């Protein structure tokens, strides 16, 4: 089955043509980073307007690169949530229009479930596996027993990891997106220069909390002033190590508790070089199989939407014109929240 997938949950406008939920014929992502950089973060209204301006060209380019037309498409999959309401509605409206005009089946996809399934675009993974999704809005641990069969084991109680990276970067006066800049600066720093706290590391749960770490950073800046040069690199490296330490330890503790020896890490923060490195070291030490998608599949993209989309379309599921944006759409065991 050839699926046209569309993703507009936040500030990336993306479209992809994927065959059988595995083979990427094309994947186009248009970033809005420059549009939001001046504000230091994503502005929902601007994101929606940019999606409206960009999505026709993005879909057209995806079709061109795949060397197909809409006549070849057999189904449409679109991000239904979670995400920004206005942004989601742009993608949904376009997907509905195409599906209606072409009489194609249409299915809504959970953005987070798509992150969990992105690894299948590069390799097959046996179920069950333990998955960590780390992004600007999520730091969640899941047991994955199949598409539509996800159980939440732990989640962020306040700031997600990606949000913490961006907020700390803003405190330090770094450009947006802050997570990338912290990773870059940290490569030249000493990760043991500052002993930042590890929130909830020993609380016995698999939940995360990064607001306290953010407060510790703010206190350090107020006490010492804004770091510069080598001190800034050390500061970034120490903060990054604290975040990665908690993510790594809780992930593998959860895997051990669940009796699972396969771990998948996904989401935009999975692009972070230190996290990828520390996850690899921890997996090797524990004899656990670690799988992290290529960076292009960790950030928001439409190709990953096609993986669960293809599955649900084959199961005969159709959302039709009734599909609406689901700003909050938690995964759970019952159909990955599709009925929740």
Swiss-Prot record:
Which annotated residues bind Fe cation? Answer: 111, 115, 300
Question: Which keywords fit this entry according to its UniProt record?
Answer: Acyltransferase, Cytoplasm, Iron, Metal-binding, Transferase, tRNA processing
Q: What function does the entry list?
A: Required for the formation of a threonylcarbamoyl group on adenosine at position 37 (t(6)A37) in tRNAs that read codons beginning with adenine. Is involved in the transfer of the threonylcarbamoyl moiety of threonylcarbamoyl-AMP (TC-AMP) to the N6 group of A37, together with TsaE and TsaB. TsaD likely plays a direct catalytic role in this reaction.
UniProt GO MF annotations? iron ion binding; N(6)-L-threonylcarbamoyladenine synthase activity
Q: What family classification does the UniProt entry report for this protein?
A: Belongs to the KAE1 / TsaD family.
Q: Where in the cell is it found?
A: Cytoplasm
EC number per UniProt: 2.3.1.234
Where is the major localization of this protein? cytoplasm
Q: Which residues bind substrate?
A: 133-137, 166, 179, 183, 272
Q: What is this protein called?
A: tRNA N6-adenosine threonylcarbamoyltransferase
What is this organism's lineage? Answer: Bacteria, Pseudomonadati, Thermodesulfobacteriota, Desulfuromonadia, Geobacterales
What NCBIfam families does the database record attribute to this sequence? Answer: gcp_kae1, T6A_TsaD_YgjD
What HAMAP family does UniProt report for this protein, alphabetically? TsaD
**Can you quote a single GO CC term?**
cytoplasm
Cofactor(s) recorded in Swiss-Prot or TrEMBL: Fe(2+)
Keyword Transferase attached: yes
């Amino acid at each position: 089955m050839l699926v046209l997938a569309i993703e507009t949950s936040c500030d990336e406008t993306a479209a992809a043509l994927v065959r059988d939920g595995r083979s990427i014929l094309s994947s186009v992502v248009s970033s809005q980073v420059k549009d939001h950089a001046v504000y230091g973060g994503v502005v929902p209204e601007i994101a929606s307007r940019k999606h409206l301006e960009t999505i026709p060209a993005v879909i057209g380019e995806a079709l061109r690169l795949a060397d197909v037309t809409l006549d070849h498409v057999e189904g449409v999959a679109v991000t239904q949530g979670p995400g920004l309401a206005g942004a989601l509605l742009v993608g949904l409206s376009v997907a509905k229009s195409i599906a209606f005009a072409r009489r194609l089946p249409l299915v809504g996809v959970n953005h987070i479930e798509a992150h969990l399934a992105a690894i299948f675009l590069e390799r097959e993974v046996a179920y069950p596996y333990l998955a960590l999704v780390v992004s600007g809005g999520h730091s969640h641990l899941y047991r994955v027993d199949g598409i539509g069969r996800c159980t939440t084991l732990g989640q962020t109680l306040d700031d997600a990891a990606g949000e913490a990276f961006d907020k700390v970067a803003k405190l330090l006066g770094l450009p947006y997106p802050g997570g990338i800049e912290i990773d870059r600066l940290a490569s030249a720093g000493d990760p043991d220069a500052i002993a930042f706290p590890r929130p909830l590391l020993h609380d016995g749960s698999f939940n995360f909390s990064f607001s306290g770490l953010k407060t510790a950073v703010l206190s350090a800046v107020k006490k010492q002033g804004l770091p510069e040069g080598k001190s800034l690199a050390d500061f970034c490296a120490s903060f990054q190590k604290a975040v990665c330490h908690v993510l790594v330890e809780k992930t593998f503790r959860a895997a051990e508790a669940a009796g699972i020896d396969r771990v998948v890490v996904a989401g935009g923060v999975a692009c972070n070089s230190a996290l990828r490195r520390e996850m690899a070291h921890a997996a090797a030490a524990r004899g656990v199989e670690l799988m992290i998608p290529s960076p292009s599949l960790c950030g928001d993209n439409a190709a990953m939407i096609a993986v669960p989309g293809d599955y649900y379309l084959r199961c005969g599921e159709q959302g039709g014109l009734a599909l609406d944006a689901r700003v909050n759409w938690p995964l759970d065991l019952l159909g990955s929240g599709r009925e929740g």
